[in-house]
């Protein structure tokens, strides 16, 4: 009952937030309820982000999603019809790389969160493994989130929307954004029409079944031609992530 009341309040805040932001999943369709068991909804001080459960105790999201009063929801699909196995967790520990921001791009935009209590696999909750190889240009990738499905005016879905996009040549994003970090991926549709943006920050980019990216930044308005999304490249951080999880909290980030 408490979780239901919390989610009702979250919906109200979600509506308010969407009126301020046009940068979310555009050009997609409703996700299948069984395709996003790893997807987390991260809520902190009026801001919404996505996240990815990578084992029973850890979630990956974007560094710039870090705000006070963070709550992490798992097992969610329709925000108006609560799944029986939906859970709420809080951060027990947070880990970052040194984060530098210029006027356009976040560098090392990654945050590893240890949950206050582990979760169990269930009908709507299961982790997504870290990648074994980096993606190649042209790879088909899946993105998802609960954000607005129209831009610039907001239209909110009750369920997360998913879209297929592609890994693009790094030069496309270099031309679109100043100061692009080397540990990022460029992904979208070159001619526009499908994309993720700010409101889905921290959500996953899944290419050929592997968790390859964390949404960092995108164009505004979103889904514009030659303005694809920029994603933190998860493969480059796998050693750091695994070291932190194993207890080496002084592990070095990639350069």
UniProtKB/Swiss-Prot annotation:
Transmembrane segments: none annotated. One of its GO terms (biological process) is proteolysis. Snake venom serine protease that selectively cleaves the heavy chain of protein C (PROC). This activation is thrombomodulin-independent. GO terms for cellular component: extracellular region; secretory granule. Residues 25-246 form the Peptidase S1 domain. Monomer. It is an enzyme of class 3 (hydrolase). It comes from the Eukaryota. Residues 1-18 form the signal peptide. Its EC number is 3.4.21.-. Expressed by the venom gland. Belongs to the peptidase S1 family. Snake venom subfamily. PROSITE patterns: TRYPSIN_DOM, TRYPSIN_SER. The active site is at residues 64, 109, 201. Glycans are attached at residues 45, 102, 153. Disulfide bonds join 31-162, 49-65, 97-253, 141-207, 173-186, 197-222. It is found in: Secreted. One of its GO terms (molecular function) is toxin activity. InterPro entries: Peptidase_S1_PA, Peptidase_S1_PA_chymotrypsin, Peptidase_S1A, Trypsin_dom, TRYPSIN_SER. Keywords: Blood coagulation cascade inhibiting toxin, Disulfide bond, Glycoprotein, Hemostasis impairing toxin, Hydrolase, Protease, Secreted, Serine protease, Signal, Toxin, Zymogen. This is Protein C activator. Residues 19-24 form a propeptide. The keyword Signal applies.
